[in-house]
A protein has these predicted regions:
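Soluble catalytic domains of enzymes that build or remodel membrane lipids, polysaccharides, and related
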Residues: 1-139
Length: 139
């Protein structure tokens, strides 16, 4: 199995009579982070298919995904939970409304993974590294 980078594009996975569109966009962030993502381009040709969007910055969900698309699941990261979480509190919540875990709105969902690494400071306090396994099941 090889890797396929999805820069503002998608690939469709077929299994039996079912299909899932894996959609990937380049970074789509709030300033000072760049916005190179082109969601309409990436979604073109996915009508009527269950969509999983890979978008690095979770702010993309409220800014464009919820109001302008029918993406059912967005997978994101970026926040690292600010590498700090004590008893469920992280300062990340002041910058990112969705900063860790699963969020739902209507028939759309966002999962934010806090990642494995760190930014600037080589440590984590309470915001332990994670690898997430998501199992999609037919309704």
């Amino acid at each position: 199995m090889g890797w396929q980078v999805l820069n503002n594009e998608h690939t469709i996975i077929h299994r039996g009579h079912d299909s899932i569109a894996l959609v990937g966009v380049e970074n789509s962030g709030n300033p000072p982070f760049p916005n190179y993502g082109d969601l309409p381009k990436a979604l073109k040709g996915t009508d009527g298919i269950f969509k999983v969007l890979l978008s690095h910055d979770p702010t993309h969900w409220r800014r464009e995904v919820l109001p302008e698309s029918d993406v059912q699941l967005m997978l994101s990261g970026h926040t690292h939970e600010m590498q700090f979480s004590i008893f469920g509190f992280s300062p990340a919540k002041f910058v990112y409304p969705e900063h860790n875990g699963l969020y739902r709105e209507g028939n759309q969902a966002l999962f934010v993974n806090v990642g494995l690494g760190y930014l600037m400071f080589p440590m984590r306090l309470g915001a332990w590294p994670e690898i997430t396994v998501i199992t999609l099941k037919k309704e």
